[in-house]
Curated annotation (Swiss-Prot):
Keywords: Cell membrane, Membrane, Transmembrane, Transmembrane helix. The keyword Transmembrane helix applies. The keyword Transmembrane applies. InterPro entries: MPN160_family. It is found in: Cell membrane. This is Uncharacterized protein MG147 homolog. It is a multi-pass membrane protein. Gene3D superfamilies: 1.10.1760.20. One of its GO terms (cellular component) is plasma membrane. Its main location: membrane. The chain crosses the membrane at residues 21-41, 66-86, 163-183, 197-217, 236-256, 292-312, 339-359. Signal peptide: none annotated.
Length: 377
């Protein structure tokens, strides 16, 4: 009973315990998968997957249902285990004076390094804004890749919790596939619209290395839950996510330097940190949209083109896979059809990345504020 009261007190008063609420996301996903599996198991019907029909019998355990139950059980068990481990860490942590809860929960961020010489360039009324000191490419890349500056050794548990949450979000959004995008010659393709945005967000949460691991792991979990895909298409999705992630990182953070700027505002001899999008930063964000959208859209379209050849194993049957009528001169061996195919898919996927980047721009400040609030950045 005393242990329970102590745990409740820690959860209420310890500021770092708020991060444990993020585990509610994988918990909700696992319960949703279990419910989905139970509904499949207890009902019968005909499911239209677009390219084939799935006949389901009541109370007959299929491979899809078995995989769903196993994955959901593993996610649920890991979530409960991480929550228990987090509670144990809270109880084992150093005790503080609970008579001053506000002081006990304070987690001030370290003061930013400022360049006072830049004060004249950021004069806003009575406020003097100092820009943060710039880092060299090698120093910033090492910091972003390993994420060392975002987590101390004591907070490694929080990194694993966040990785689990981001994998769950990426997996859930990868299930939202947009089918029936009609191509000019009458066939259609389907693509995933939202999951790449999670990778853009994850860079400033867990670092580039951990985000790359998320991009590698998620497509294979998706294959387990939705086995209508082939391993070759899974390799394509994995490779595409990795390439897009690194292209976005180098173009956005290094070539155009479009990241929101961290500044320190001095008011009445007191320093206040804030995030500012200067005019130069806004222009850089707009310019970064063009190459990232076009390059990533072309790479994903080219991946679809190569993937069909790999899946079918021979060039002559490509038309039967992509074009339903199998008419003469309608396959992807014809150079004109190849150009039309790549132009169409590049346009579609460029629009996809445009919306994802605009979404990332809209939440970028919130991402960094959350990271600072939990001491992650």
């Amino acid at each position: 009973m005393l242990w329970t009261r102590a745990l409740i007190l820690e959860l209420k008063t310890n500021k770092q315990s708020r991060l444990l609420w993020l585990l509610a996301i994988p918990l909700l996903i696992s319960l949703t998968l279990l419910t989905y599996g139970l509904v499949l198991f207890s009902s019968s019907g005909r499911i239209d997957h677009g390219d084939h029909f799935h006949l389901r019998e009541r109370f007959v355990l299929t491979t899809e249902e078995l995989v769903t139950f196993v994955v959901a059980s593993v996610v649920f068990a890991l979530t409960v285990a991480l929550f228990g481990l987090g509670c144990w860490k809270l109880l084992q942590g150093p005790k503080v004076d609970r008579t001053n809860i506000k002081l006990a929960n304070s987690n001030p961020a370290p003061q930013a390094v400022v360049l006072q010489a830049d004060c004249d360039h950021f004069q806003v009324g009575d406020h003097c804004v100092f820009s943060a000191e710039k880092q060299h490419f090698k120093q910033q890349f090492k910091q972003d890749f390993l994420g060392k500056s975002k987590f101390s050794f004591r907070n490694e548990l929080y990194r694993f919790c966040l990785i689990g949450v981001l994998i769950s979000l990426n997996l859930a959004l990868s299930m939202v596939e947009i089918p029936g995008i009609v191509l000019p010659w009458g066939s259609s393709i389907q693509f995933r619209f939202f999951n790449t945005a999670i990778l853009f967000i994850a860079i400033r949460f867990v670092g580039l290395l951990s985000t790359s691991l998320i991009a590698i792991i998620t497509p294979w979990i998706h294959l387990l839950l939705h086995p209508v895909h082939t391993p070759i298409s899974t390799v394509f999705y994995m490779g595409n996510d990795l390439v897009v992630l690194w292209i976005f990182y180098f173009f956005y953070y290094h070539i155009f330097k479009a990241e929101v700027k961290q500044t320190t505002t001095v008011v009445n001899n007191k320093e206040f940190s804030q995030l500012v999008n200067t005019h130069k930063t806004k222009v850089a964000k707009a310019l970064a949209l063009i190459p990232v959208n076009l390059i990533c859209g072309f790479i994903e379209g080219l991946g679809f083109y190569v993937g069909y050849f790999l899946i079918l194993g021979k060039f002559g049957s490509v038309g039967h896979k992509i074009f339903y009528d199998s008419q003469a001169n309608r396959d992807l061996i014809n150079s004109a059809n190849v150009i039309y195919f790549l132009l169409t898919t590049t346009t579609i996927f460029s629009l996809k990345y445009l919306f994802e980047l605009l979404f990332f721009y809209s939440v970028e400040k919130g991402i960094l504020n959350i990271s600072r609030h939990f001491g992650l950045y």
